[in-house]
Amino acid sequence: MKIGINSIIGVTTVATVMSCSSAKKEYASFELYPVRTGSLTEMEYTPEATKFTLWSPTAEEVRLMLYDEGEGGHAYETVKMELGEDGTWATVVNKNLLNKFYTFNVKINDKWQGDTPGINAHAVGVNGKRAAIIDWKATNPEGWENDQRPPLKSPADMIIYEMHHRDFSVDSTSGIKNKGKFLALTEHGTMNSDKLLTGIDHLIELGVTHVHLLPSYDYASVDETKLDENQYNWGYDPLNYNVPDGSYSTDPCLLYTSDA
């Protein structure tokens, strides 16, 4: 999911905790890398504290960078992370970080490699450069915990429709309000100028039972701050695999959930 806050670009004080000594790990092959144990989650939020973890066994140092905004501005705090036995770096920040943003900064071969939201980020700011700190329970639509897929007796019963989010609804005659957006899949009763069904209702009348979505994750080539410009890509240039792309949202800076 995409989440963001209107950016206020400015200079802030950076509090940095530096390491007195660097961890140096060398491995003869990938097979010798330690295997991460436990959850792959890189951010675990509670109002009292947030735990951050990053699996990076070859890193010499890892820093957590905290931001007020999803883009622009500077990190307001830098926190040293500690290395565990399985190659995972971790730290806990004992304060309420709800709606803040973060990146990891990794040093390898005595060189800082730049910022990353982590490969397991599930919420990011505009254009996916920083991960977002959110309360997962608060993002679920009402009744989400009771949602169940329709029963399927046999895979042979499936009638599959391959769909690209933008192409499915973007046509000017589609009769769909949220053209090219995720919300287009929630609209019913839409018709074109010839009074023919469009959108989800058209798939239903075709007898489609399953929809195969072309890439929906966050990809790099579309600038989500310039959606009024003519930008297009099918999405085969992934940036954050576990985050829906912001260009398909009605506003990349806002959070909306729907159980449709």
Regions found by a protein language model. Give the residues of each.
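Aromatic-lined carbohydrate-binding/catalytic grooves of carbohydrate-active enzymes
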Residues: 170-186, 206-255
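The feature marks proteins involved in alpha-glucan
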Residues: 23-47, 83-187
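Conserved small/polar residues in nucleotide/adenosyl-binding loops
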Residues: 256-260
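Short proline/glycine-enriched turn/loop motifs at strand-loop junctions of beta-rich domains
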Residues: 56-61
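C-terminal motif of bacterial Sec signal peptides marking the signal peptidase cleavage site
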Residues: 18-19
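Bacterial N-terminal signal peptides that target proteins for export
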Residues: 1-8
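Conserved, mostly hydrophobic/aromatic
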Residues: 54, 163, 213
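Structural beta-strand segments of beta-rich domains
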Residues: 48-52
